[in-house]
């Protein structure tokens, strides 16, 4: 969940900066100078949409370290850190890519993998997770994060986000142009779009951005199932991954802990559409039914 939220927030911030810069440079005025040029608008939307998404990808590892306060283990300071590095080294070797950076951060049970490529990736685990699980369960979580890197999930998410960004920007500006023309009526101005265009384009971008996040989260949930299966394959057995999920979800107590509920690791109803992870019960069922 953490890597998805960080990526989406960074993507939103980058898109906002690029959009404001484009407006200050008069790009919108150019696009609407002789009526709305749909081809140019689509090209502009794709440039900003994919550009913002790939800039977010390039910044993902730095942003993750900064926002979580993660401490990269350069030299193991104790046996636990040595075990962490050795385990990630073995898992990444099995997965067929260079060993990623390994980091630890303070907080409730959590873990994430991020980075722009397999050779420039990061795996981080929280102190809360290390304290609440045995080593076999921690290894399963590490295998899950290594599987995310192996499957290229950050790049896949970047491409999906780029497509989503493109359509959000395109539709928002096209509809804003219609709204602006309606508000201005027969008024003819050579100075470009009016205030109605600026206000409505921002409103439409926010609205479509929220709706588009449902698409991104849908693909994220699918990738979680693949990462669970990948973890089982890397470890050669499914039981440890199932046990780790049970600890994370607190299934023994019959309820999710507050930390995981707030992270959207499981949910129902409309909120499930905005969750980056499937319900833990569904993930366990998928692992148990796998052949």
Swiss-Prot record:
Broad class of where this protein is predominantly found: membrane
The annotated active site, in chain numbering, is 145
- Pfam families of this UniProt entry? Peptidase_M48
Q: How does it sit in the membrane?
A: Multi-pass membrane protein
Q: Where in the cell is it found?
A: Cell inner membrane
Q: How is the cofactor bound?
A: Binds 1 zinc ion per subunit.
Supply one GO molecular-function term: zinc ion binding
> What Gene Ontology terms describe where this protein resides (cellular component)?
plasma membrane
* Protein name, as recorded: Protease HtpX homolog
What organism does this protein naturally occur in?
A: Prosthecochloris aestuarii (strain DSM 271 / SK 413)
What is the taxonomic lineage of the source species? Bacteria, Pseudomonadati, Chlorobiota, Chlorobiia, Chlorobiales
Give the gene symbol: htpX
């Amino acid at each position: 969940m953490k890597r998805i939220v960080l990526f989406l927030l960074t993507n939103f911030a980058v898109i906002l900066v690029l959009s404001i810069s484009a407006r200050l440079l008069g790009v919108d005025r150019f696009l609407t100078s002789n009526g709305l040029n749909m081809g140019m608008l689509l090209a502009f939307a794709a440039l900003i949409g994919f550009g913002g998404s790939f800039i977010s990808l390039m910044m993902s590892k730095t942003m993750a370290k900064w926002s979580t306060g993660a401490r990269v283990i350069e030299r193991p300071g104790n046996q636990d850190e040595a075990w962490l590095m050795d385990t990630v080294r073995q898992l990444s070797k099995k997965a067929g890519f260079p060993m990623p950076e390994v980091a630890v951060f303070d907080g409730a049970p959590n873990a994430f993998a991020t980075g722009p490529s397999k050779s420039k990736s990061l795996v981080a685990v929280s102190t809360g997770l290390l304290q609440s699980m045995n080593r076999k369960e921690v290894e399963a979580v590490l295998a899950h994060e290594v599987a995310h890197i192996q499957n290229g999930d950050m790049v896949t998410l970047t491409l999906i986000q780029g497509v989503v960004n493109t359509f959000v920007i395109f539709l928002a500006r096209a509809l804003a142009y219609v709204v602006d023309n309606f508000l201005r009526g027969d008024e003819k101005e050579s100075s470009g779009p009016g205030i109605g265009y600026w206000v409505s384009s921002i409103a439409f971008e926010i609205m479509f951005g929220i709706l588009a996040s449902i698409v991104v989260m849908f693909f994220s949930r699918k990738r979680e199932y693949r990462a669970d299966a990948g973890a089982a394959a890397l470890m050669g057995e499914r039981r440890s991954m199932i046990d780790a999920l049970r600890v994370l979800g607190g299934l023994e107590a019959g309820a999710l802990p507050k930390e995981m509920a707030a992270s959207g690791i499981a949910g129902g109803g409309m909120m499930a559409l905005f969750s980056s992870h499937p319900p833990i019960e569904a993930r366990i069922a998928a692992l148990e039914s796998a052949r």
